[in-house]
Every structure is written in C-alpha cells, then in structure tokens.
Amino acid sequence: MFGQRQSMIVYLHSLKHAKILRKYGNIHYISKRLKYAVVYCDMEQIEHMMQKLNKLPFVKKVEQSYRPFLKTEFENSRPDRAKEYDYS
C-alpha cells in the first residue's frame, strides 16, 4: 500500500514560502531558527523532486537524506552494563 519514503532537507532563504513545499511532498519538520524544512516523498521521485525544488527562487539548496541506505544493526557492540543486572 505504501511505497518507500525518503526525506529531503530543503534550505530556504525565507520561511514565508514554506507552505509551497506541500506540493512537493509531506512536510515533516520546519526549523524557524535555521531556516530549513524536512520533506518526505517517494524514493522513485526523489531525484525529480530535488530538481524541481532547486529551481524555486526561495530555495538555497536541497540535500537528500541517506538514512535509508545506512546499516542500523551494529556488529561487535558491547551490551550496556546496567542492563546486564536483574533487579527483580
């Protein structure tokens, strides 16, 4: 039902135009202080959306999130010592 999603970080000159980003995907977060927005869209459309967003006059730059491509299971990591003890 749902496809794979990926986020883009869109840096803006002004937050006045942040509502326009709704056309390009789901807005997850907007930082007022650092002037960026996190926008989610389908993985198949990520390159196309990045090109469209870069053409907008109020956008400084667009970066792709690499989180879906990172390995989240770590090898040789030591377990936490506090969790080793049974407190029952």
Swiss-Prot record:
The keyword Transmembrane is annotated on this UniProt entry: no
Transmembrane segments: none
Alphabetically ordered keywords of this record: Cytoplasm
Protein origin, superkingdom: Bacteria
Record's subcellular location: Cytoplasm
A Pfam family that the UniProt record links to this protein: DUF2129
GO CC entries: cytoplasm
Keyword Cytoplasm: yes
NCBIfam families hit by this protein: PRK02886.1 (NF002777)
Family from the record: Belongs to the UPF0298 family.
Name of this chain's protein: UPF0298 protein BcerKBAB4_3759
